[in-house]
């Protein structure tokens, strides 16, 4: 891997590289809140600390981010995984192994800095019961608290979609879950994105209508959108693509996210799953079937994206645009019960279309599932860093690699895949590729559970 190159930032990793000074200070001074909360804090709190340090956040911002986690993440992750424990009553669908937490690392452009984000599905004590069949109570509590804690927060759009993407007869949801023999499944997620001078709050909605099968149908989505904004040129363009284009007809809508800020500045991201990973399909979707004009800059961006995907998957230079990227069964994951009615969600690429009012055409991002198509986590990391370094963006590559090794302290990165889940790309107006790596802490990985020490005191470096 490339050298760090961060001459202005003195990193604060403790001896052995398993935590940072900020995390150790907070862990020693903040009060215990019970075994489950403490366990999640020791796991994901330490991971967050290492990522913030690797991304060279100022020390005061590191403390701020960790305190957000302490107050608004760790207490809401449900029962902590333990070796030999019964499976949790509510199993999150945020990750394949049931971990209700996700990290992302937005890669720096030349001369810039990375951004770190976390997302989670809050799990309340009554999740899946007749009192809270959709597991919404914890999320509503957190949003109420964060609306005061995050400057500039505005929940207007979140309130609208909470009211229109779900039914409100909890008794019928309880009956449906009993008929299914399992809980309804994940429907609300939130994320905090930590920029250097601000923090952004987003809400994600996975609709769960009573008459819904695997995916909510397009007319039901549109009914919700129309209640917010009757006319939207970007949304009209997406609908035309979905109904007339061969690739568009294959897309399945499964999620929506909104920025919880002033509606004048917020985005509405509509997420779809595609069964394809071939680059011709990626190009067709990211141009909206030719509706987004081809330019010299965009042509170069597509060439760069294809080169990047061939690099991380270790495919040869003349790999055809029409070929699906080969599937690599290396992560040990299988279809968990909550995905039984939507197995397509575990393969193919994911896209979002930003359909916020004021745009004639949507901004589009593709999420490539590296967990399915790359040899192992070390290969993904090394190949991505090599690509970034060759384009003057490798300043943080080595620090990112070391952070991943710390997070995966229960195994070696070269042993398997699955820690890194997606690599996303959005084309920027300046010609750069906006890239983000997403990863799963794998809290329920058998190796992590057996790796735990038999006894430990709160605040130790390792969970």
Swiss-Prot record:
Q: Which InterPro entries match?
A: Aro_prenylTrfase, Aro_prenylTrfase_DMATS, DMATS-type_fun
Biological processes, Gene Ontology terms: alkaloid metabolic process
The annotated pathway is: Secondary metabolite biosynthesis
User: What phenotype has been reported when the gene encoding this protein is knocked out?
Assistant: Impairs the production of the xanthones variecoxanthone A, emericellin, shamixanthone and epishamixanthone; and accumulates several upstream metabolites, including emodin, chrysophanol and monodictyphenone.
Q: Write down the EC number.
A: 2.5.1.-
Keyword Mitochondrion among record annotations: no
CDD domains attached to this UniProt entry? PT-DMATS_CymD
Q: Give UniProt keywords alphabetically.
A: Transferase
Q: Which Pfam families match?
A: Trp_DMAT (PF11991)
| The protein's enzyme class | transferase
Which GO terms of the molecular function aspect are on file? prenyltransferase activity
Q: Does the keyword Transferase apply?
A: yes
Q: How is its activity regulated?
A: Mn(2+) and Co(2+) strongly enhance prenylation activity.
So which residues are the signal peptide here?
A: none
Give the similarity note. Belongs to the tryptophan dimethylallyltransferase family.
PANTHER family, A to Z: INDOLE PRENYLTRANSFERASE TDIB-RELATED (PTHR40627), PRENYLTRANSFERASE ASQH1-RELATED (PTHR40627:SF4)
Role: Dehydrogenase involved in the conversion of monodictyphenone to the prenyl xanthones such as emericellin, shamixanthone and epishamixanthone. Monodictyphenone is first converted to variecoxanthone A via a paeciloxanthone intermediate by the consecutive actions of the FAD-dependent monooxygenase mdpD and the xanthone prenyltransferase xptB. Variecoxanthone A is further prenylated to emericellin by xptA before being reduced to shamixanthone and epishamixanthone by the dehydrogenase xptC.
What this protein is called in its record is Xanthone prenyltransferase B
């Amino acid at each position: 891997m490339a050298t760090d190159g961060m001459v202005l930032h003195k990193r604060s990793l403790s001896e052995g590289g398993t935590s940072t000074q900020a995390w150790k200070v907070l862990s020693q001074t903040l009060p215990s809140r019970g075994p489950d909360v403490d366990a999640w804090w020791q796991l994901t709190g330490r991971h967050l600390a290492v990522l913030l340090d690797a991304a060279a956040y100022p020390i005061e911002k590191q403390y701020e981010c960790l305190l957000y986690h302490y107050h608004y993440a760790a207490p809401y992750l449900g029962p902590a995984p333990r070796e030999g424990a019964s499976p949790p009553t509510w199993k999150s669908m945020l990750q394949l192994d049931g971990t209700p937490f996700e990290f992302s690392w937005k890669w720096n452009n030349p001369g810039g800095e990375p951004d770190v984000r976390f997302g989670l599905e809050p799990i309340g004590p009554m999740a899946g019961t007749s009192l809270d069949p959709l597991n919404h109570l914890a999320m509503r509590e957190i949003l109420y608290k964060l609306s005061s804690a995050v400057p500039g927060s505005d929940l207007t759009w979140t309130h609208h979609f909470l009211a229109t993407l779900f039914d409100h007869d909890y008794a019928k949801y309880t009956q449906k879950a009993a008929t299914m023999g399992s809980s309804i499944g994940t429907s609300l997620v939130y994320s905090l994105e930590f920029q250097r001078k601000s923090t952004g709050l987003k809400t994600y909605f996975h609709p769960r209508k009573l008459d819904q099968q695997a995916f909510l149908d397009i007319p039901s989505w549109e009914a919700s959108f129309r209640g917010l904004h009757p006319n939207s040129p970007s949304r009209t363009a997406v609908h035309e693509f979905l109904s007339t284009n061969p690739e568009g007809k294959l897309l399945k809508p499964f999620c929506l996210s909104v920025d919880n800020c002033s509606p004048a500045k917020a985005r509405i991201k509509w997420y779809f799953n595609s069964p394809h990973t071939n680059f011709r399909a990626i190009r067709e979707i990211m141009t909206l079937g030719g509706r987004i004009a081809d330019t010299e800059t965009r042509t170069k961006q597509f060439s760069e994206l294809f080169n990047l995907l061939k690099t991380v998957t270790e495919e040869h230079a003349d790999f055809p645009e029409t070929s699906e990227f080969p599937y690599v069964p290396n992560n040990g994951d299988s279809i968990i019960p909550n995905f039984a009615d939507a197995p397509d969600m575990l393969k193919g690429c994911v896209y979002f279309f930003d359909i916020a009012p004021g745009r004639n055409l949507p901004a589009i991002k593709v999420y490539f599932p590296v967990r399915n198509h790359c040899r192992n986590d070390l290969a993904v990391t090394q190949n991505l860093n090599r690509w970034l370094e060759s384009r003057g963006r490798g300043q943080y590559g080595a620090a990112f690699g070391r952070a991943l090794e710390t997070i995966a302290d229960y195994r070696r990165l070269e042993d398997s895949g699955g820690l890194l889940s997606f690599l996303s790309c959005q084309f920027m107006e300046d010609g750069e590729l906006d890239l983000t790596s997403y990863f799963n802490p794998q809290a329920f990985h058998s190796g992590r559970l057996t790796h735990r020490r038999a006894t430990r005191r709160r605040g130790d470096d390792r969970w």
